[in-house]
């Protein structure tokens, strides 16, 4: 939601969209391509076109980023470096997607682009917002009084 994973992937895959690549090549080859690019793949990931607008709105609430790493340790390092370089002082928790729900609590909000993560978060007692765009997420946050 902050970074443009698709743009980075398409650059690494000579223009093939992530969903198409994974469908045609399989999940293992998908992650091999990404992880083969090393830590730079993650550190160099560009902002989403509306990512800074979204961040500017939420930063006053001192959000904690909850992000899923890839299979490789390089993604963990790369994501930490990206946050350090772009959002200094922001806390980052790395957790597999299936484990994100373990961080849910009544007053915690998960903003995520995967419906399954939102569903699990809500089932665990948290507030979930399915991120489609910065404008839509900001609208939903305002509806919550933020």
Tell me the role of every PLM-derived stretch.
Residues 22, 31, 35-65, 72-77:
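Short, acidic loop-to-helix structural element flanking the phosphoryl-transfer center
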Residues 1-35, 123:
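Active-site neighborhood of HAD-like aspartate-dependent phosphohydrolases
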Residues 66-109, 115-118:
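Substrate-recognition "cap/lid" segment bordering the active-site pocket of phosphatases
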Residues 59, 88, 124-125:
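Short, structured coil segments at secondary-structure junctions
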């Amino acid at each position: 939601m902050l970074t443009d994973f698709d743009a980075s992937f398409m650059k690494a895959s000579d223009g093939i969209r992530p969903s198409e690549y994974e469908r045609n090549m399989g999940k293992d080859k998908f992650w091999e391509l990404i992880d083969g690019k090393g830590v730079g793949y993650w550190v160099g990931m560009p902002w989403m076109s509306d990512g800074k607008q979204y961040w500017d709105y939420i930063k006053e609430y001192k959000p904690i980023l909850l992000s899923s790493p890839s299979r490789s340790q390089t993604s963990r390092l790369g994501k930490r470096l990206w946050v350090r370089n772009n959002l200094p002082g922001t806390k980052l928790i790395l957790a597999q997607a299936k484990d994100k729900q373990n961080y849910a609590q009544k007053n915690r909000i998960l903003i995520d682009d995967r419906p399954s993560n939102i569903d699990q978060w809500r089932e665990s007692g948290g507030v979930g917002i399915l991120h489609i765009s910065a404008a839509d997420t900001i609208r939903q946050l305002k509806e919550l009084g933020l």
